[in-house]
Design a protein with these regions (language model features):
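Mobile active-site "lid"/loop adjacent to the S-adenosyl-L-methionine
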Residues: 189-214
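Conserved SAM/SAH cofactor-binding pocket of Class I
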Residues: 103-187, 193
């Protein structure tokens, strides 16, 4: 099978598993507790994902509950980022619905690539704030970081505050670019060109490559003369799924 075929088969298997898990409904009490024998206590995980309990009973799918519990564990323990230096100020704590930087290749690229300037950088799609943190630790004096998702902005703010870098990074809610130009514009977009099937998948899936195309279309209008745009990483899945070799 080609890479594109393998990708679609994997997505089909994921969708089948999701349908099964979505067919199992779990009743929740007004405080998010589960009134079933030997049920786990997932109240904190529910609160982190949905906000404070309202006191009303509700029902959730097993699929959604497993997703938010997994996100809670990542948020609790965090992810060590070697590019941020020595412990303890080198961990990123992802929130529910925000991509966890467990694969650090793209972070390493930002940490190692020569900087065109240390005056200003834009971080498009800030997510957890990991790339903004790396740029600030490398000496960039000011980073303007954007995201359209309030969850991501809250996550980035919490991480940057914990890393003692919030005074160097300005967070803005925006669809792609902030106003103005910068000598460096960095973007790590969702790299899978497919439809997200749950809130947590929006950090990975970009239907129609909307964000990727928007970044490329608007980059020149937001770069200073001689500036650089870093698209990290180039999506192998995107290339394979859309390639049309000519002979």
């Amino acid at each position: 099978a080609t890479a594109a075929e393998a990708f679609h088969l994997h997505r089909q298997a994921q969708a089948q598993r999701a349908r099964v898990l979505a067919s199992v409904l779990i009743p929740l009490e007004g405080d998010y507790s589960i009134a079933l024998r030997r049920a786990p206590d997932w109240r904190q995980a529910c609160t982190e994902a949905w906000g404070p309990a309202t006191g009303e009973r509700s029902v959730a799918t097993l699929r959604e509950l497993l997703g938010l519990v997994g996100a809670h564990e990542w948020r609790k323990k965090g992810v060590e980022i070697p590019a941020l230096g020595a412990p303890p100020l080198n961990r990123i704590h992802p929130h529910y619905g925000v991509f966890s930087p467990v694969r650090g290749e793209y972070v390493g690229l930002v940490a190692a690539a020569p900087l065109p300037s240390k005056a200003l950088a834009f971080d498009i799609g800030v997510g957890t704030g990991v790339l903004s943190a790396v740029l600030a630790r490398r000496g960039v004096q000011r980073v303007v970081a954007t995201d359209q998702d309030p969850r991501a902005l809250a996550c980035a703010r919490e991480n940057l505050q914990r890393l003692q870098l919030l005074d160097r990074v300005e967070l803005q809610q925006a669809d792609l670019f902030p106003p103005g130009r910068a000598p460096l514009v960095v973007c790590n977009p969702p790299w899978v060109p497919a439809r997200a099937n749950s809130p947590i998948e929006h950090a990975v899936y970009d239907e129609g490559s909307r964000m990727l195309k928007g970044f490329l279309a608007g980059l020149s209008a937001h770069l200073e003369p001689g500036g650089e745009g870093w698209l990290i990483p180039v999506s192998y899945t995107h290339l394979r799924a859309h390639e049309t070799p000519e002979h």
